[in-house]
């Protein structure tokens, strides 16, 4: 994966004296947003892949969410929710750092999305097939702004319950949008989801 550096074209290379260590190279940073509905697994996704201790702004569920944030049976076991964002970082070969920002899932915090998406190359939209309607807002948001995104169907129990073509049809996404299974708890699965998004974003930038 090659992202452009900000080096000045034609500038002479600096000579490093013998025996002196090469100066550290500033990493190339890439911002990615992890989105989706309430209780879909965004915090878990970032936590499974981050090289650093994830920053999570979670708060206890309150009566304010009743009738507003429907997570079906998930509400029975979910006692906290992200109220601002989740943040994590993963370092890849070639001095490439991926900064991961998770959106708050509750509807009343959607006003923060514009700030979180600023500067991002794209988004991973997590999908819960038991509550497809919960990710409609995310899909509509990124499509309306022509921001590259992928749909990662989260297999909560490690079992794929719905066909990917059926999910694509239900969400009415364009054929070029990647739709695939993932497991937000599994580092390798989340890494593959991020690689798929970066590849899509690079292809879009290259025309």
Task: Give, region by region, the residue ranges found by the protein language model.
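Canonical P-loop GTPase G-domain recognition
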Residues: 157-207
